[in-house]
A protein has these predicted regions:
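Feature for soluble, non-membrane regions of globular proteins
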Residues: 1-210
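Active-site flanking residues adjacent to catalytic metal/cofactor-binding acidic residues
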Residues: 159, 250-252
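Rhodanese-like catalytic fold shared by cysteine-dependent sulfurtransferases
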Residues: 199-247, 255-290, 295-337
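Short glycine-rich, polar/acidic loop-and-turn segments at beta strand-coil junctions
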Residues: 78, 83, 253-254, 295
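Residue-level detector of functional hotspots within protein domains
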Residues: 51, 58, 63, 68, ...
Length: 337
C-alpha cells in the first residue's frame, strides 16, 4: 500500500512556546520526507525478484521499511498529541497515580528519560502494555524499538530536527515547552482505546454542524469534518493536475499572510479571499476549482464553500499548502505570479 500524507492535525500558530516555523518545518520536511521514503522503499520491494535477490538486499529493505513505518506513525502521534493547554485530565491523573504512584512521579521519570537523550536522538513514549496491562515510559531508538504488544499514548520526538530551530542545543527548554502543549484529552482517548474501554462519543456524534460562515482559526479538523464540505487530498489533487492541461487551482491565503511568504504551489494563482465577488467571475464554471489555504483549517474551506454556493464544482485541499509541500509537491516563487 502507498502511505498518504495526513493533514497537520494542530494549529501550528497557536502553540505555547513552539513556533509555527519550527512545527511546519518538522511536518513538511521531516515527516513528509519520511512518508515519501517509505513509498519509495515499498516500490523497490514490489519490483524485487525475491527468487534471485540477495539476502542482504531483502534484509536491508525490510529494515528500512520497518524504520520508516515507525517514523511515520510516531510523527503522526507526536503532532496529534500537541495543541492542548497542558492541563491534565482527572482520568489521566488517576491512571498515573495507579501506575506510577503520583502524577509528579510519572512526570519526573518521563522528563528525565527525555533529558537522557540530549545530544542524541530517539523518541520518548508513554506506552500501554496490553500484555502487562500497565503504563511504561520508554525510549524508542531508530523509530522501531517499541514495546511488544504495546500502544504509545504519548509521544515526544527527541531528534534534533524537532527542536533545533527554536531551541538550538537547549533540549531541556524544548521538553518543558512540549509538556505545556500536551493535549491530555487525546492522550486519555488513546489510553482508553488501548485498554478497550473507549466509549463512543455521543456528544461528538450529536454535535450540530456549524455554519460555514462561522469558520475561524479556532476550529479544529474534527469540527471542519462535521461540515461535510467537498474536499480533496494532496494525492487526489496531484492526479487531477496531471490529467488536465490547466487545472483551476486557487491560493486563497489572506493578503496579509500571502505577503509574508515567497512561494506557492506551482501552477496556482493567488486570489484575495476578501474579493471573491470580483475574481469569481473569471473562473470557468465548466471546470472544477481546487482551493487551498495555508493548513486547510478555515480560509480554504470557506472560500470553497462560497464558490459552491455560486454554482462552481469547488473543493478545498485537506491540509492546505503545507500538506502539498510535505508530499513533495512542486512550488514556485510567488513573485513570479
Amino acid at each position: 500500500m502507498r502511505q498518504t500524507i495526513i493533514p497537520i492535525p494542530i494549529r501550528p500558530w497557536a502553540l505555547n512556546g513552539l513556533s509555527e516555523r519550527m512545527m511546519v518545518s518538522h511536518y513538511e520536511n521531516d515527516y513528509g520526507t519520511t512518508v515519501r521514503t517509505l513509498n519509495e522503499i515499498r516500490e523497490e520491494l514490489a519490483e524485487l525478484d525475491l527468487a534471485t535477490a540477495r539476502g542482504y538486499r531483502v534484509r536491508s529493505l525490510k529494515r528500512e521499511e520497518h524504520a520508516a513505518m515507525g517514523s511515520v506513525a510516531l510523527h503522526e502521534l507526536y503532532f496529534s498529541n500537541l495543541g492542548g493547554d497542558g492541563r491534565m485530565t482527572s482520568a489521566m491523573a488517576a491512571a498515573f497515580t495507579e501506575h506510577f504512584g503520583s502524577v509528579e512521579l510519572w512526570r519526573k521519570e518521563f522528563m528525565a528519560t527525555a533529558r537522557s537523550l540530549r545530544g542524541g536522538s530517539g523518541w520518548v513514549l508513554l506506552s500501554y502494555s496490553r500484555r502487562d496491562r500497565w503504563l511504561y515510559n520508554q525510549i524508542a531508538l531508530d523509530h522501531s524499538n517499541v514495546l511488544v504488544d504495546a500502544t504509545p499514548v504519548l509521544v515526544l520526538d527527541m531528534y534534533e530536527h524537532a527542536y533545533h530551530i527554536d531551541f538550538g542545543a537547549n533540549a531541556v527548554a524544548y521538553i518543558d515547552a512540549f509538556m505545556r502543549n500536551i493535549d491530555w484529552e487525546v492522550v486519555g482517548a488513546r489510553l482508553a482505546e488501548a485498554k478497550g474501554t473507549a466509549a463512543r462519543s455521543q456528544e461528538a456524534d450529536a454535535a450540530p454542524a456549524r455554519s460555514v460562515k462561522e469558520l475561524s482559526s479556532e476550529f479544529d479538523l474534527s469540527a471542519i469534518d462535521r461540515l461535510n464540505l467537498p474536499s480533496i487530498t494532496v494525492e487526489e489533487l496531484s492526479a487531477e493536475i496531471a490529467k488536465r492541461d490547466h487545472a483551476q487551482v486557487l491560493d486563497a491565503r489572506p493578503a496579509h499572510y500571502f505577503s509574508r511568504y515567497h512561494d506557492m504551489m506551482k501552477g496556482a494563482i493567488w486570489r484575495d479571499p476578501a474579493l471573491i465577488d470580483e475574481w469569481s467571475k473569471e473562473l470557468s464554471p465548466s471546470e472544477p476549482v481546487f482551493v487551498y489555504c495555508a493548513y486547510g483549517f478555515h480560509v480554504g474551506c470557506r472560500v470553497a464553500a462560497e464558490l459552491c454556493e455560486r454554482g462552481f464544482d469547488a473543493k478545498y485541499l485537506r491540509g492546505g499548502l503545507s500538506s502539498w509541500y510535505a508530499a513533495g509537491g512542486a512550488r514556485t516563487l510567488s513573485r513570479e505570479k
